[in-house]
Swiss-Prot record:
Name of the protein this chain belongs to: 18.3 kDa class I heat shock protein
Alphabetical UniProt keywords: Cytoplasm, Stress response
Origin superkingdom: Eukaryota
Species annotation: Oxybasis rubra
InterPro entries found in the cross-reference section: A-crystallin/Hsp20_dom, HSP20-like_chaperone, Small_HSP
Claim: Cytoplasm is one of the keywords in the record: yes
Coarse class of the protein's main subcellular location: cytoplasm
PANTHER family registered for this protein in UniProt: HEAT-SHOCK PROTEIN 20 FAMILY MEMBER
Entry's localization field: Cytoplasm
Domain sHSP per the UniProt entry, residue ranges: 48-161
Subunit note: Forms oligomeric structures.
Similarity comment: family membership: Belongs to the small heat shock protein (HSP20) family.
CDD domains xrefs: ACD_ScHsp26_like (cd06472)
Length: 161
């Protein structure tokens, strides 16, 4: 039995007196105040823009390169920019325009997202930023950043007397 009721502070999660993090709301000076985000008027396209703005990008490292893959369905390669800024920051950006609406059309559902996106990645020191390559195929952007070869350790033989 908990000494603190389940609906205390209306957080939706069960409080546990033995869990030091379950009572964090007590010490939060802003807890219970209305969120400013909830009072901001949202356009009808805000949700779809947010979905596209958070373009998901995978980053893997192989022995030869850093490889970035982004799912960008419906985006043309002309609408995507891949840049290296400040010497070691990879910037991937672009936009997908919203379809032109005809006055006689009635939309029953709009689930495809549109809008702008931009993601930045700080590249490691071993990246060859002057040899970055990018390609787009079937709505997937692939950016390859080659790596410098790791310096081979120099071995010096020591004579034993």
């Amino acid at each position: 039995m908990s000494l603190i009721p389940n609906n205390w502070f209306n957080t939706g999660r069960r409080s546990n007196i033995f869990d030091p993090f379950s009572l964090d709301e007590i010490w939060d000076p802003f807890f219970g105040l209305p969120s400013t985000l909830s009072t901001v008027p949202r356009s009808e396209t805000a949700a779809e823009t947010a979905a596209f703005a958070n373009a998901r990008i995978d980053w893997k490292e192989t022995p030869e390169a850093h490889v970035f893959k982004a799912d960008l369905p419906g985006v043309k390669k002309e609408e995507v920019k891949v840049e290296v800024e400040d010497g070691n920051v990879l910037r991937i950006s672009g936009q997908r325009a919203r379809e032109k609406e005809e006055k006689n059309d009635t939309w029953h559902r709009v689930e495809r997202s549109s809008g702008q996106f931009m993601r930045k990645f700080r590249l490691p020191e071993n990246a060859k930023v002057d040899q970055v390559k990018a390609g787009m195929e079937n709505g997937v952007l692939t950016v390859t950043v080659p790596k410098n070869e790791a310096p081979k350790p120099q071995v010096k033989a020591i004579n034993v007397y």
